[in-house]
A protein has these predicted regions:
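Extended catalytic cores of very large enzyme megasubunits
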Residues: 1-355
Length: 355
């Protein structure tokens, strides 16, 4: 069985382990009615993978954006993984009903990303398992595709920057304390070594505020200054400071997009509110932006090569293979994409040892 079974199933039955209720529901086998569990382990969370819906609402319901983070936390806590398609959420600049404009999808995805990174799945050292999916016609699709590689470039900048700061701090301190004249060591006019060290630091883009801090501390008698040395370890401090590292990110690709790529055509992006209005008024939606389909496909290919995301989910093919098409459209998948089904459903994974 998959991890939630190992983490949860049988703990109450075999050992009498209980836990405070967490909002889990169960079907009473005798009455057939749904009830709330009074213990986290008496009727445990055994399902491995979930697909959850999310609406274009900040708060106010379990399917709201903030409601989804709460549901995800509950699933992660007991060892399950979850995926959602976020295409219903308005893009940056779309009008809000209460006035103003939306801050965009990425601002909300970063909240969920940070929450997932803080939770140990099943109380163990395993990270939370999370899938984020977005339709290719979403107005924030370009920013979404670039999200993870841009954040990983920030990690490289942090690693390089920490080394550069340390190198120039050492150089400036050395130029000060190796100068023989106590009165002139802090003057760039008399201490040419200090002047050269500062010029080198400025040329390497060391912020002048950092240079001034080094000088101020030296005047107070400091002989050295230690900056934290960052590295590219995925569990290190550099990666902990950036976003987009706690989910698998995928794009939903319809056949119409691939046809546009092959024909050298264009691809349109649509505000979510415009798509809803067009559907209500039985008309074609007006695009908010039009892209070269081939260029967008190249962006997907490059970022997948650069950082292994986004993954590609072929939306048309997936729904052609749908086993329950009358029940609704398949919009997303679980974190590993082996389970593709309706929103707000779950499955139990298992494996067989063939050795």
């Amino acid at each position: 069985p998959n991890s939630p079974q190992w983490f949860n199933t049988g703990l109450h039955w075999a050992y009498g382990i209980e836990g405070p209720p967490q909002g889990h529901s169960f079907v009473d086998p005798e009455t057939g009615e749904v009830g709330l569990s009074t213990s986290a382990y008496e009727h445990p969370q055994p399902h491995a993978c979930f697909i959850q819906s999310v609406s274009d609402s900040l708060v106010g319901g379990t399917d709201s954006i903030m409601g989804l983070w709460n549901r995800e936390a509950l699933l992660f806590k007991y060892g399950s993984g979850t995926g959602s398609n976020f295409s219903n959420i308005r893009g940056a600049g779309e009008p809000l009903s209460g006035g103003g404009t939306s801050s965009g999808l990425l601002s909300f995805l970063k909240i969920g990303d940070r929450a997932a990174g803080a939770i140990k799945s099943g109380g163990t050292t395993r990270r939370a398992a999370k899938m984020v999916t977005l339709d290719l016609d979403h107005p924030d699709i370009e920013e979404y595709i670039d999200w993870k590689p841009t954040e990983e470039e920030k990690v490289s900048a942090l690693v390089i920057g920490s080394a550069i700061l340390q190198k120039h701090a050492d150089s400036i301190m050395e130029s000060i304390w190796s100068f023989g004249d106590d009165e002139g060591r802090f003057s760039q006019k008399t201490n040419l070594g200090l002047r050269k060290a500062m010029v080198r630091a400025i040329n390497d883009s060391v912020p002048q505020a950092h240079i001034q801090r080094i000088l101020d501390l030296a005047e107070q008698g400091w002989k050295g200054l230690e900056f934290e040395s960052l590295d590219t370890d995925w569990q290190g401090e550099a990666y902990a400071t950036v976003s987009g590292q706690n989910s698998n990110n995928s794009v939903r690709v319809p056949n119409s997009f691939m046809d546009a790529v092959k024909s050298g055509g264009e691809w349109s992006l649509y505000f979510r509110t415009e798509r809803e209005s067009a559907a209500d008024e039985d008309r074609d939606p007006v695009p908010c932006k039009t892209l070269d389909a081939g260029a967008l496909w190249d962006k997907v290919a490059y970022t997948a090569w650069a950082c292994a995301d986004p993954g590609v989910q072929f939306d048309t093919t997936i729904n052609e293979w749908h086993t329950c098409p009358e029940a609704g459209k398949i919009n997303g998948s679980n974190p590993c994409s082996e389970y593709m089904f309706l929103d707000d459903t779950a499955c139990n994974l298992a494996s067989i040892n063939l050795l």
